[in-house]
Every structure is written in C-alpha cells, then in structure tokens.
Amino acid sequence: MTSQTCQLICPGLTKYSVAWEWQRSLVQQRHNCPELADVLILLEHPQVYTLGQGAKLDFLKFDPTQNKYELHRVERGGEVTYHCPGQLVGYPILNLKHYQQDLHWYLRQLEEVLIKVLDIFGLKGERYPGLTGVWLEGRKVGAIGIKVSRWITMHGFALNVSPNLEGFQRIVPCGISDKSVGSLAQFIPSITTDEVLPLVANAFAKVFGVKLVKSTNAILF
C-alpha cells in the first residue's frame, strides 16, 4: 500500500448541512484534480437525522412532514441514522485508486479503525456477517455509510462515544430492528469525544497507512 499524506481537519461541532457541503466541494475538487491530498474530517453534529439515498421512510417513527426534527436525504448508502453531540463522526475523502478499488475492502477498513479504537479501552468490537458496522456486546456503537464516485469517497462513519441515545428511539437505526444501539460511555462512563478523537485519527492512519497532517478549516472554503 502506498503511503499517502492525509489532511486532518477537526472543526468541532458543525451543522450537518455545512459539513455535507464541505464534503461535496472536496470531492468535486478531487474529481477536477486527482493529485490533491486525501482528507479526514473528524467532528460532531447537533441533533440531526439522515436518510441514505434509497432509505425507506418506514424506519422513521415521526412524521417527516411536520419539520419537528432536522432531516436530510443524502447520497450515502444505508437507511436512517442519527447524529448528535457525543458521537464522533468521520468523513474520509479518499482517492481509492491510491489504496484498493474495492468497496467491500473499504468498508471493512473503516470497521477496523473503530475496532482498533475500542481495543485501546479493552473493549471487543465485533462485526456481524452481512451487516456493516461495529457492535459491542450486541449493541451497535459504530455506524458506516459511504458514497464513492469515480473512486473518491465521501460520508463515512459515526462512533457513539457518549451521546444521549434517546434520539435513536425515534427511528429504526440503519433499518435493523432486532439489535440495539449502544455507546462507549455505557462501558466507560467518563469517556469523552475529546479523548477519543486523537485515537480515531491514529487508528485511521495505521489502518490506511497514511501520514496525517493537521490542517486548518481554510482548505474547506
């Protein structure tokens, strides 16, 4: 695997619509100029629900026409998910031509990043055959949904560090009704996203074989 430079951007709590526009802009830039460096954005979102491109409204437990909760339908695969403070979200903008042009491989790599982070805390992250994500003692703590166009990735993963899980009760998360959602805080009550963020960054660098270079938000504009 070729060692790549990857710019790390950590903008903190960011509106979903703003981060979504950042991703689309970064992807377009790399379509125009494939030599640009890869990017990893690590952040948190205020409360928001997102639907994958082909997601079913049946998995919502609220009326989307009432505008009670912020809701976006986006380009990623998968069903409905929920973002909120306390959940660490990662958006890798990678050119898979520099890695492997294999979506299955990419999804497993993202899972491996989260599994390695859990292992640091002595927690055993698990995969389930036929499903995408990471579970901890039967509770889903890591969700993954991606979009890849011309081998440039966007969207990514969400790790439940210490979120208020109440928001997940308004949906069938990822369309999986027989498995519950959990968080790292259920096992390590004092854990914070500030503590976990650098661990996710380091695990990402190891799994993908990249050199992370912390960048300012300026490259997003």
UniProtKB/Swiss-Prot annotation:
GO terms for cellular component: cytoplasm. GO terms for molecular function: lipoyl(octanoyl) transferase activity. InterPro entries: aa-tRNA-synth_II/BPL/LPL, BPL_LPL_catalytic, Octanoyltransferase, Octanoyltransferase_CS. It is an enzyme of class 2 (transferase). GO terms for biological process: protein modification process. Its main location: cytoplasm. Pathway: Protein modification; protein lipoylation via endogenous pathway; protein N(6)-(lipoyl)lysine from octanoyl-[acyl-carrier-protein]: step 1/2. Residues 34-212 form the BPL/LPL catalytic domain. The record marks 140 as: Lowers pKa of active site Cys. The active site is at 174 (acyl-thioester intermediate). Keywords: Acyltransferase, Cytoplasm, Transferase. PROSITE patterns: BPL_LPL_CATALYTIC (PS51733), LIPB (PS01313). It comes from the Bacteria. Pfam families: LplA-B_cat. It is found in: Cytoplasm. It catalyses: octanoyl-[ACP] + L-lysyl-[protein] = N(6)-octanoyl-L-lysyl-[protein] + holo-[ACP] + H(+). Its EC number is 2.3.1.181. Catalyzes the transfer of endogenously produced octanoic acid from octanoyl-acyl-carrier-protein onto the lipoyl domains of lipoate-dependent enzymes. Lipoyl-ACP can also act as a substrate although octanoyl-ACP is likely to be the physiological substrate. In the reaction, the free carboxyl group of octanoic acid is attached via an amide linkage to the epsilon-amino group of a specific lysine residue of lipoyl domains of lipoate-dependent enzymes. Belongs to the LipB family. This is Octanoyltransferase. It comes from Trichodesmium erythraeum (strain IMS101). The gene is lipB.
